[in-house]
Amino acid sequence: VYDRWRNTNNNSLVVKVSFGNASFLFPGDIMAEAEKELVELAGADLACTVLLVPHHGSRSSSTQSFLATVQPEIAVISAGWKNRFRFPHPTVLQAYQKEGCRILRTDRQGAITISTDGDQLTVAPFILSDDPPGAD
């Protein structure tokens, strides 16, 4: 049997949640191949206010086409502090910065809570500094 998604990361469930004028896109660990297909199938419907950055900020995701389509205001990167993969990748950070996104990172800010009333977003990182835990 031919598996068009040879990497199981591309089988991740992708969910978009909308409430009023706010929307959140959770693309799991998808990679460039799945991003391309999503852009082709959903197009502008992928646009969101908050994006959980695909695959923890791996350079195998967050293609220019995907970012241009999704156009997030806030990009949240879920990555462990000093993780062995060194996520997020510097080129991914640069891509989101170039798009003008506010970047939040769990490796630096710990748990991040984002809530909305449908119009305004409230962002509450556990650690208010951009310095990673234990930094002196």
Task: Please annotate each region the language model reported.
Residues 35-110:
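Cap/insert and terminal regions of metallo-dependent hydrolase folds
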Residues 1-50, 108-136:
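Core dinuclear metal-dependent hydrolase active-site scaffold
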